[in-house]
A protein has these predicted regions:
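Extracellular secreted precursors and ectodomains with disulfide-bonded cysteine-rich loops/domains
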Residues: 10, 48, 130-134
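Bacterial Sec-dependent N-terminal signal peptides
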Residues: 6-25
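N-terminal glycine/threonine-rich, aromatic-flanked beta-hairpin/loop signature
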Residues: 33-75
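An anionic, turn-rich surface loop/hairpin at beta-sheet edges
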Residues: 69-91
């Protein structure tokens, strides 16, 4: 799955963004058109259209702002969640306040890898999800628009 996600991001272009290795993804809501990322200390929650996934912890970035993390993804989430969560890999790169990412989902039912993205989101921007709402992170009871937090 990593090979797909890395190849998808390579086509996006962009230059490397020097930063300290071990920097973490800024906490808060990252929004775009039909894509959203909500980063907390305990989980990174991602939406692409009417699908969503959860990736454990807060994403650690390398010196160029790149990352890859494994988690679980629901391919049929709205209007009614159908099917199991499936193994997935979220990979991407942060340059400034912009995150470009791709997701490779191992569809264990259809026995194929499903690619989502690339998607681009900006820190602090409200996601424009159209007909598909941004759902709550498991256990989250407060507003979904989390103030951005820059930390190194």
């Amino acid at each position: 799955m990593l090979a797909f996600a890395t190849a998808a991001l390579a086509t996006c272009g962009g230059s490397d963004s020097p930063m300290s290795a071990g920097t973490r993804l800024a906490l808060g809501t990252w929004g775009g058109n039909n894509v959203a990322v909500i980063a907390t200390d305990s989980i990174t929650h991602v939406h692409v259209g009417c699908t969503f996934g959860d990736f454990p912890g807060n994403v650690t970035l390398d010196a160029n702002g790149r990352f890859a993390i494994n988690g679980a993804y629901m391919l049929h989430a709205f209007p009614v969640a159908v099917g199991p969560s499936m193994p997935a890999q979220l990979s991407g790169q942060v340059i400034g306040a912009t995150l470009t990412f791709a997701i490779a989902v191992n569809d264990t039912v259809a026995k194929q890898v499903v690619s989502l993205g690339p998607g681009t989101v900006e820190l602090g921007k409200v996601p424009n999800m159209g007909a598909c709402p941004v759902c709550a992170i498991p256990g989250m009871t407060h507003a979904l628009l989390i103030k951005p937090s820059r930390r190194k």
